[in-house]
Amino acid sequence: MTSHIKVIYLEDKSAFAASIGNSLTERGFTTEVFNESAEQIEAIDGVVLFHENHNFDRHIAELRDLFDKRQVATHKIDMSGTMNVALSHLSLFFDRIKCKNVLFLGSENLKDNPKLEIFKEKWHL
C-alpha cells in the first residue's frame, strides 16, 4: 500500500513528468514540482528511476548519483522489461521502504514509450 506517500516530486517542464503527472494525481497522489532546492533534496527519502536498458540522460544520471551519495533508497523500472514484474517490484519497494517524499525521474524519450501507458493503467497501489 502507498498510503504513507505524502508527495511525489516530478521535474518541471519534463515531457516524462507531464505524461505521468495526471495519472498520479488521478490516483490521489499529491505531486509537486522538483526544483532541486536543498530543502527538497533533504526531504526526499525515495527515488524511482524509469529507464530503458539502463540508459539515463546526463541530468538524470547526475541526480541518481546525488541521491546515491545521500544513501536515499532508489528503485529502477526498466521500461523495456515486463511491466507486471516492474509493478510488482515497485509495490514491494514501497512496502519495504515506507518513503513519504518520492522523486520520480525519467528521460524525455520515455514519454512515447508504449509501456508507460501500460504502467499508468495497471499501477493500482
In which residue ranges do the predicted regions lie?
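Acidic/glycine-enriched connector segments
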Residues: 2-108, 112-123
